[in-house]
Amino acid sequence: MKITFLDFEQPIAELEAKIEELRFAQDDSAVDISAEILRLQKKSQSLTNSIYGKLTPWQISQVARHPQRPYTLDYIQNLFTDFEELHGDRGFADDYAIIGGLARFDGQTVMVIGHQKGRDTKEKIHRNFGMPKPEGYRKALRLMRLAEKFAIPLFTFIDTPGAYPGIGAEERGQSEAIGHNLYVMAELKVPVICTVIGEGGSGGALAVAVGDAIQMLQYATYSVISPEGCASILWKSADKAPEAAEIMGITAHRLKTLGLIDKIIDEPSGGAHRDQPATMQAVKKALQDSLKLLQEYSIHMLLEKRFERLMGYGQFKEVKVR
């Protein structure tokens, strides 16, 4: 698959285009140009490392939204076996922006739930651009309760710009569905491991992201609103999105500093889409480590630690200034 380059990656794109030209010319050339191709490849890798070593929060948000970035189904297909998708909320409809079902992880039966975006126009519409409606969150809730009933670990993958804000969704209780999920996940009697793989947009992300281990991919984002949305409110212009991204603290490193996530999963240079096998291996290792650690605790201890985590959010200290 041909890589789609972002605006700030254009110097890399130009080098890669030259490499492709040389590869094409090599087939009809009597001169060996493999050394030149190798030199340009090394230069491209060095440039990629340099650019990705100093990304701004706004640029990271663009990487998090990259159209070729691995989605939940990609992780399910690569990390789990015997996946059996479960459909519907048993109340209204089946929401294709949320997928979930039973699977095996290293031979152990687990429940997997995640947001799912689309690749082409048809699939994007089918998946509602990864924006769940109330029935999607209620489907997720049904699967969470099944996981609890059968005492199996729960894995969630977060990648959404936010919950769908349409009139129908609001009429069917979007905020209630999100709030109910938060309430149930806070006391779910199984290990819960949440991984932000792309965009973690507001309550739409949080509705499947309350757990015992919260981890993020290196170039994922997690925030109460998109940078564009924040800029539109504060400055009445989405053009200020880069400034908003800087202020909001949407990156994995910033959130780790604040104690809102537990672990950052390193991505290949250039992002998860540049080397999906390496990304899958890194995520699998992180999931294995988290599951092994959580299974050492009793359910009572898990719930106690989860409660302490939730009650610890938003704490601050007052300091007298003399």
From Swiss-Prot:
This is Acetyl-coenzyme A carboxylase carboxyl transferase subunit alpha. It comes from Nitrosospira multiformis (strain ATCC 25196 / NCIMB 11849 / C 71). SUPFAM superfamilies: ClpP/crotonase (SSF52096). It catalyses: N(6)-carboxybiotinyl-L-lysyl-[protein] + acetyl-CoA = N(6)-biotinyl-L-lysyl-[protein] + malonyl-CoA. The keyword Cytoplasm applies. GO terms for biological process: fatty acid biosynthetic process; malonyl-CoA biosynthetic process. Acetyl-CoA carboxylase is a heterohexamer composed of biotin carboxyl carrier protein (AccB), biotin carboxylase (AccC) and two subunits each of ACCase subunit alpha (AccA) and ACCase subunit beta (AccD). Residues 30-293 form the CoA carboxyltransferase C-terminal domain. GO terms for cellular component: acetyl-CoA carboxylase complex. Keywords: ATP-binding, Cytoplasm, Fatty acid biosynthesis, Fatty acid metabolism, Lipid biosynthesis, Lipid metabolism, Nucleotide-binding, Transferase.
